[in-house]
Structures are given as structure tokens and as C-alpha cells.
Design a protein with these regions (language model features):
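Cysteine-dependent hydrolase recognition
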Residues: 1-172
């Protein structure tokens, strides 16, 4: 982060419209976050976007395909009651995937926004698979070379370099 990674800046950037968006980071059914390693070697969580700020998206007519890299961001069986119970459990010392009550998951909220949001989203319905460090000492972060982020980046590679423009074929 350059120190300006804030939720309002994410909303503003997406509201400008784009063809694709890659939200790489961490998440829950109701929010997506990035990590800032500049001040903390373990990484400090920075809120990128939550479902309650999605109605502020105003990219009408320019709806991107959004690839979401975070755990549970596309957990399609999220419900308000389930998330409320999950939040209560978390507050009483039994952590769950929910950090706030939500009626539907992050991925679906992006698609269903009138006048903003996305035309399609791809994301994890459960835990994502990430890694940190540089285990093979090639000066390329493992997060780019392995597991979930590697898969996400292959989608863009297949689209851009292989010319596959049918969404299901590009992601499959």
C-alpha cells in the first residue's frame, strides 16, 4: 500500500468502470481486505470493501468481471440469520467466518447492485488456499506462484495471451 488504500478509494476506483478487477487478499462472506506489509512484517489488515458500501458503486454501464481472492467471499449459502448467529458466536469466543451480519455473500452483492457492481464474479465459497514467503528463493513471492493466486492469475493469462474470451472457458 502507498498509504492511500481505503474503502472509499476502492469504491471510487471501481466506480470509474473497468473490464476486469482482481481483488487479491483476505475475506469473509461480507467483506474483502488486503494486507499491508510496509509497517508490519506480519501484515496489517486493511478493509477494502464490504457489502454495506457496495450500493455506493456507480459504474453504470461499465460492469467488470471481478476475480475475488479471499476466503468465503462467494459463500453462496450466506443468510442474515446464519451470519447473525455467527457474529454472536464470534463475540462469545467461538470464531466463525462471519464478521458482520449480512443477507447474502460479497460476490453476489457485487453482481446484484443496480447501477454499479459487476457483471460476474469468481471467488471462494470456503477457505482459500494461500501462501506467504519465498520458499524456493527465486525472489518471486510464493503468493504469486502457488495455490489460489496462481489460479486467479491464470484466468487473466488465458484471456489475454490465449485469446479465450468465453468466460466459462477462460476460468475453467
Amino acid at each position: 500500500s502507498l498509504g492511500n488504500f481505503k474503502q472509499k478509494n476502492v469504491v471510487n476506483a471501481l466506480s470509474e468502470g473497468c473490464g476486469f478487477a482482481h481483488l487479491s487478499g483476505h475475506g469473509s462472506p461480507g467483506m474483502w481486505m488486503a494486507k499491508d506489509f510496509t509497517e508490519d512484517p506480519q501484515g496489517k489488515y486493511l478493509l477494502g470493501l464490504d457489502v454495506y458500501h457496495m450500493p455506493l458503486l456507480s459504474n453504470k454501464g461499465e460492469y467488470p468481471i471481478v476475480v475475488i481472492g479471499g476466503c468465503h467471499n462467494s459463500m453462496f449459502n450466506a443468510t442474515f440469520l446464519g451470519s447473525l448467529i455467527g457474529c454472536i458466536k464470534s463475540l462469545t469466543g467461538n470464531p466463525t467466518w462471519y464478521w458482520m451480519p449480512i443477507p447474502e455473500c460479497f460476490g453476489w452483492w457485487l453482481v446484484k447492485q443496480p447501477g454499479g457492481g459487476a457483471i460476474a464474479t469468481f471467488g471462494c465459497t470456503g477457505l482459500g488456499l494461500g501462501t506467504v514467503g519465498d520458499s524456493n528463493h527465486d525472489n518471486i513471492p510464493d503468493s504469486l506462484q502457488f495455490l489460489l493466486t496462481w489460479l486467479e492469475l491464470r484466468f487473466f493469462e488465458v484471456y489475454a495471451q490465449n485469446g479465450i474470451s468465453i468466460l466459462g472457458q477462460a476460468y475453467g
